[in-house]
Every structure is written in structure tokens, then in C-alpha cells.
């Protein structure tokens, strides 16, 4: 078993005298972590404690403690792209991770568990199911990740950022920062503007080399139109981006990071960016039109699926990342830079897709399930393809867990002491 804990001094394992926390499973990328942090902020504002389960040495171990949220971590990593030998050993590693996650759940005794995706979410969600903690899933992308696909089969509620990800989903949206959701309507910002067209290019925290190359080339080919340009490029690619604009003879403000994204969106007439779920949620909340260039290597091409949702509402233009990107970007910019009416129409269309209260809605649903649950599994149910079910028995008031008849998969002991205690009960033999 490998479990480590951060910020344990800030919040000890809950006792019967304390309110039981909500556990968030999220990690690996900002796309999973930041929605979890947004929901955690809402829950804590309501007086609900939050605890986090992540993976060793992953991004969440640096970000989550900054918010004074206790985090436990598992020794787990992704399986995609691994060699045959490592894949053959994966079941053993997953079983160990589920066992370790069960240890954490018995220690933290969460009143509900929600997965936003990431390496630790799989073992954490399976342990929650086996121990009877109410489990929810929030999927940010239109093309669901592997972990949430599995967990969705036996989660109590399946929440999504975009419609069309799962059957029986609840499309609540992706959480965005309050200051972005509070921006004035597009017409209040854009109508009557004079001067150069303001273009905001977002490469994300890691930068986007394709945008670093295509945007300067496209603008130079347009004959240096009257444009005011801000390009967020990430720290690692800053020198490369500055050199590309210098070579193209295009003036641009190149920034590795933008601290005030609300002000940046309010400033922009048009955004050129990738199509991550959180970025698109911000574009909609702000109400700004965009040219979307999905990351070509994204898992299951999920960024293209995300972008298609905005394109279908006439809120964005989609360009594929390939060798002709600069030429096609030049053509699109030539049209949009000269057409303020089209830009305003795209901005209004984006705003109609916004779900600015997503974090509040997710928190509401978590607490609905936490309030209705007693720390025991829900009624017998089985979702297609997984074969996991919970059977209620009356012997000593315990629950018997069956996993497709395979006792080797029963990683969490099924005696009454191993289950999450009922509210108000003592922690019993929990470590």
C-alpha cells in the first residue's frame, strides 16, 4: 500500500463530532483540477469540509495544498501508451491502488465522493463504490475520459460539462471563475468600440507551438492589418513566440501567463485558442467569439468534440491543426477582422451556451446525494458492461459486496468494521 498525505496537520481525520467531508477525486491536468477547486470553494463557503485524493508527484500535489485542502495521494499513473509488460502488470497495480484508496476513505469517512477524472479517480471511485460512499461523476469533455467512463456505470449521478457525453447525464456545465461569469453582456462591451481589432491568443499554461507559428504567419500574410494582439504563450515557449512575431514583422504583446483572465476576455474582440473544456466554458461565460484550433494529440480527439459544440451554435470557427493551418487562419481572420457584426453575433451565441452557476449546481447535487445517503450503498443496481452490484443483507446489518463473483477483486474487507460508519457513529476500527 502506498498512501501519502499533504496538509495532514491542517485537518485531522474526521471524528464523529465533526462534519464529514466531501472527497474530490481529480488530478493530472488543470482541466480536471480547476473544476474540482471551484466546487471545493463553493462547498467550503457553505461550511462543508473538503478532502482530496490525487496521485503521487502529480500537478494536484502542488495546487491543492495552496488552497488549504488536505490531500492524500496514491502511487498510480496512466495506462495509455504503456508497453506490453507494464500493461500486463496493470491489474495488480490497480488492485493495490484500490486497496490504498479504501484505506484513505476509511480514514476520511467522506459523506460523498465526486470524480472529476485523473489517475487516482479510478481507484478512488471503485473504493467509494465498494465501501458504499455516494459516488458522483463530473465529466468536463464531450468525449469522456476512460476513468469517468468506467465510474459512470455505477455512479449515483453523472454530471457533464457539455450535453451528449453520457446517456442519462445531467448537463450542468463546467465551473468558471466568478469574475469571468460576472462580465457585462457582449453588446455592452463590443458595440461602439473604435480603434484596432483586439485579438487574444491563448496557448495555455504549456503554450501551443502551432499557434506560435501560425498566428504571426497569418497576420503577416494579411499585410499587417490594424490589430492589437496579446499572446499568452506559456513560460517555456516565450522566446520562440517572440522570435516568430519578430521574424514576421508583427507587433504583439507576448506574455507567458495572464493573471487576470476576466480582464483579458473583457478586452478581446476575438480569441484564438485551443479547445479545452475549461477554456470553452470561459469563452461562453465571458461571451466572446473564437477561432478554435484543437490540440491534435488530445486523447480521443476530445478537443475537436468540444469545439464542435460551439461551432454548431455559430459561436466559433474550427480549424484543424495541420500543415495548412496558417493559410486557413489567414482566410478566417481576413473575414472576421473586417466584420464587427459577425464578431458580435458569435459573442452573443457563445453567451447563450454559458452555465455560469455550474459550480453551485454541482455542489447542490453533491449535497443532495450526501444528505440522502447514510454511508451505505444505494439500492441494488448494475450498469451495463461492468457487473458490479451491491446486495443488501440483514445479517448483522452488514453489506456483502460482489464483483462479478470474483473474490480476488474484493480488495476492501466486507465486514461491518471496514465500511464507512453511519453518520453519528464512531469511527470504529478505521485507521
Curated annotation (Swiss-Prot):
UDP-N-acetyl-alpha-D-glucosamine binds at residues 29-31, 141, 177, 205, 258, 303. It comes from the Bacteria. Disulfide bonds: none annotated. InterPro entries: GlcNAc_MurG, Glyco_trans_28_C, GlycoTrans_28_N. It is found in: Cell inner membrane. Pfam families: Glyco_tran_28_C (PF04101), Glyco_transf_28 (PF03033). It is a peripheral membrane protein. One of its GO terms (cellular component) is plasma membrane. Keywords: Cell cycle, Cell division, Cell inner membrane, Cell membrane, Cell shape, Cell wall biogenesis/degradation, Glycosyltransferase, Membrane, Peptidoglycan synthesis, Transferase. The keyword Acetylation does not apply. Pathway: Cell wall biogenesis; peptidoglycan biosynthesis. It catalyses: di-trans,octa-cis-undecaprenyl diphospho-N-acetyl-alpha-D-muramoyl-L-alanyl-D-glutamyl-meso-2,6-diaminopimeloyl-D-alanyl-D-alanine + UDP-N-acetyl-alpha-D-glucosamine = di-trans,octa-cis-undecaprenyl diphospho-[N-acetyl-alpha-D-glucosaminyl-(1->4)]-N-acetyl-alpha-D-muramoyl-L-alanyl-D-glutamyl-meso-2,6-diaminopimeloyl-D-alanyl-D-alanine + UDP + H(+). One of its GO terms (biological process) is cell wall organization. Residues 395-420 have a biased composition (Polar residues). Residues 370-431 are annotated as: Disordered. It is an enzyme of class 2 (transferase). Cell wall formation. Catalyzes the transfer of a GlcNAc subunit on undecaprenyl-pyrophosphoryl-MurNAc-pentapeptide (lipid intermediate I) to form undecaprenyl-pyrophosphoryl-MurNAc-(pentapeptide)GlcNAc (lipid intermediate II). This is UDP-N-acetylglucosamine--N-acetylmuramyl-(pentapeptide) pyrophosphoryl-undecaprenol N-acetylglucosamine transferase. It comes from Xanthomonas euvesicatoria pv. vesicatoria (strain 85-10).
